[in-house]
Amino acid sequence: AGDGGTGTSSPITISSLTNGTAYTARVYAINAYGTSSASDASSSFTPSLPRAYFLGGTDGSNKTNAISYINMSTTGMDSIDFGDLAANQGNTTGCSSSTRGLVGSGLFWTGSTNSTVNTIQYITMTTSGSGQDFGDLTVARYEAGSFSNETRGVWFGGYAGGASNVIDYVTIASTGNASDFGNLLAANFSIQGTSGTTRGLMAGGYTNTRVNVIQYVTIASTADSTDFGDLSSVRSGVAGASSNTRALFANGFS
């Protein structure tokens, strides 16, 4: 229901709403003569705080199936349980639209054995729950990279008995197996990506040695990657972040 809000002019801020829940609002006036009748209900609105999600992972040889999140507009909070992946999964990578999160590739932990997987799972951002089956990547691998825009999720590179040069993609709003997008400049794993709405960048990684190459694709197309430039040093396992204007690559193994 929320705690409502007061004010002498528009807009009026309403507090204590639940993220992802639809609401309507009514307004009434209070003055020296009393309280008016409530207005008609407003159009439905759904508050949505920006969240960051964490899916699976590994600590040495121990894999986890945990999904958790934090609200990015707050500080000093621990992550909150969201649900579980289908199995303990590490060395995986994910991407998202504003409404869905996808996780694909990686290593499943089954007893004392790791198995490389091609599965893709998804969650609906505003509803806590476990990962649901989406489809399969074209190649089972781990230590792949990924990025997305609002429409497509893209995975590239990785390790599958050797480095892979495969780029494949899915339409995030649907479900189904990934389709071939093209190839990297060279087979590469421990590579990372980031993207704007139009371009996806892929940087660093390990071919037969660590590399400093940055390459790109146009996300709405299907084609092999194109050389973009170089990182300031050769390294694998970098972290990537971007806006629509600028991309940053940090850390990594040199």
Residue positions per predicted region:
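Recognizes extended acidic, P/S/T-rich segments that occur
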Residues: A1-G20, A32-Y33, A38
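Kelch-like beta-propeller repeat domains
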Residues: N31-Y33, S43-S254
